[in-house]
Amino acid sequence: MIKFLSALILLLVTTAAQAERIRDLTSVQGVRQNSLIGYGLVVGLDGTGDQTTQTPFTTQTLNNMLSQLGITVPTGTNMQLKNVAAVMVTESLPPFGRQGQTIDVVVSSMGNAKSLRGGTLLMTPLKGVDSQVYALAQGNILVGGAGASAGGSSVQVNQLNGGRITNGAVIERELPSQFGVGNTLNLQLNDEDFSMAQQIADTINRVRGYGSATALDARTIQVRVPSGNSSQVRFLADIQNMQVNVTPQDAKVVINSRTGSVVMNREVTLDSCAVAQGNLSVTVNRQANVSQPDTPFGGGQTVVTPQTQIDLRQSGGSLQSVRSSASLNNVVRALNALGATPMDLMSILQSMQSAGCLRAKLEII
């Protein structure tokens, strides 16, 4: 019986504390992506390119490209192009990217092109913040949207002014890396948490020996590693696969003010409170009345007199009790019982936090 109770307690503890790998909670400082950007031309469009009269930079770019190919356009030539579009090309250089490796690129129209569907990106250099060329992009663009127009009517599905080229860029220059230099590496938590940082350090010390890891702050854990690239790779592979029990997160409610969506995690709780909500609507209706004389030759004038009607209505407003809720399901039931719309719910949650009834951080994005 004692063994059964011990096994049951151990099962409950492991269920409450969810174990995750260190690699899912942290990243290695210095091992990151680097943004690249470039400006280029897309050709081969089916009459959906830039209107060159409104986007002179497209014509200027085309003239510069033709001159580099040995073709001279006479001065003053007015090229009415419909199959060319000026675009911006963006992508990130992955960590440890090697010369000759291919990466995907995103192509976005910067002029007034109607669609990039069916277009081909001409060779475009991709530069970093240091103005050095790190990759060259070129290829056919895949656009996820579709559209058609005829007789003044048009239909469009998804976005047509942006697309993607799979393996569309080739890395030409490698970024220098400091990996393997020195005897320490820093692991950075995805979310700052003092207890989690200390727990990861303790886990590494239990396996690798005391003093192998030190929590510097709520986000950084410094780890002592052997020198040399290959030794550090093996050391990090072992550390990143270690299991750590994840402690409960901070209670948080995230509100998107643009879309009206409300998201909360499982740690959110409510205290008992009373909520009154109501809607106030004001309707203004203005009409123009025409007054004409009764007789055609009576000397009167035809006048227009405006007539305005204002209607103010207020609905709801009765107090409703919200019970104390200790779990996410109970919180959802309590808020749904109010019958509030998502937009009303945002104001209610803000007021509940001010009143001390919402036990969570409120973040508005």
Curated annotation (Swiss-Prot):
Residues 1-19 form the signal peptide. It is found in: Periplasm; Bacterial flagellum basal body. Its main location: periplasm. The keyword Transcription regulation does not apply. GO terms for biological process: bacterial-type flagellum-dependent cell motility. One of its GO terms (molecular function) is structural molecule activity. One of its GO terms (cellular component) is bacterial-type flagellum basal body, distal rod, P ring. InterPro entries: Flag_FlgI (IPR001782). The keyword Nucleus does not apply. It holds the Pfam family FlgI. Keywords: Bacterial flagellum, Periplasm, Signal. The basal body constitutes a major portion of the flagellar organelle and consists of four rings (L,P,S, and M) mounted on a central rod. Assembles around the rod to form the L-ring and probably protects the motor/basal body from shearing forces during rotation. Belongs to the FlgI family. This is Flagellar P-ring protein. It comes from Shigella sonnei (strain Ss046). The gene is flgI.
